[in-house]
Amino acid sequence: MSHIFKKQLRKILFVAASTLLLVACNSSAPPSTTATSGDKPATSSSTATPVNNSDKKSKQDIRVQLPFLKQSTDAALIVAIEKGYFAEEGLNVTYERGFGNADTISKLGTGKYDIGFSDIYNAMEFNDKNPNDKIIAVGIYQNKGPYCILTFKENGIKTPADLVGKKIGAPIGDGARKLFPLFASEVKVSPDAVTWETMEPKLRETFLLQGKVDAVSGFYISIIPAMIKNGKTMDDLQIFYYDDFGLDFYGNGILVKQDFMTKNPEAIKSFLKAYFRGMQELVKDPSAALDLVISTDQSKLMDREAEKLRLKLGLERMYITPEVEAVGFGGVDPKRLEKSVAQTVTGFKLKPVTAADIFTDKFLPAKEQRMVPPVSDRKPLL
């Protein structure tokens, strides 16, 4: 019995010692995680992809407001975020949708956002009212303004002169509507010769389709895809592009408040470097960029064909122009910019300013870093 008891005791002591050793080993090991070295970090459609929390904290947060809902024409920003170009520059970039160019500038002016994507002409009007709190463009990503008047050929409006006596629909703050007096001057008609019908942006195309107005003003990158989606064809449309009638305006730019510009010069340089790198990627492979934008659409409501047409119009008429081929993405032709600024001063009845009061190129990357990729490197948009 004594022999059996001793044998059982040794067995119990062995099990206890093994248990204590296992506990000690586990307490000294690092805590386990659900990710492995091969896992992709969690991402969102509006946030750069940090590797971990400490890495995110080391980056400077940059808040961006878009001009409107996220669209395919925002592809350069999305590419730069999702491919980590901003993160490489030490930035954590987030964005939110906009509610029109004027609203984006207004919110940028309040300091809610660090960077706004909007046009310099609305910014000029803001600066006229807020001379001590100015907004400045640090780069232009749309070389041509998307302003137009659009109608149906069946309405019998074949030339701008045929707009006389007609009803044009647009939201009150619409850029093309605000610039209409300048357009009217160029085409030799009185700006008071038309009647304006005001509606919410989402109802603009509906009013035209229902015949409540004879034409609408707005951005052709918004109106044309909407019309095609509603069953119209390009042959059904009569479009008066403002830049075909003497208003050679720039489109949207990358805007900051003067105070932010003074305090964050390096962040602005880093943002522009990463953004125009994204633009180059967009031009090289627009189909991949389009698919990336759609993949980040959390609403799952994006129509790929409509967004494809929008991006096609942007690439052909706004992003890749002879001027951009010469000066690179983000730059301007000083004489052209000066002329459009002077036209805006006259049209908006503003205090005199120069191009230097609304635009600076001192934060742009070196020209060779933001050139348009050669044609041989560009894939078609499919």
Predicted stretch roles:
Residues 26-29:
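Bacterial signal peptide processing site
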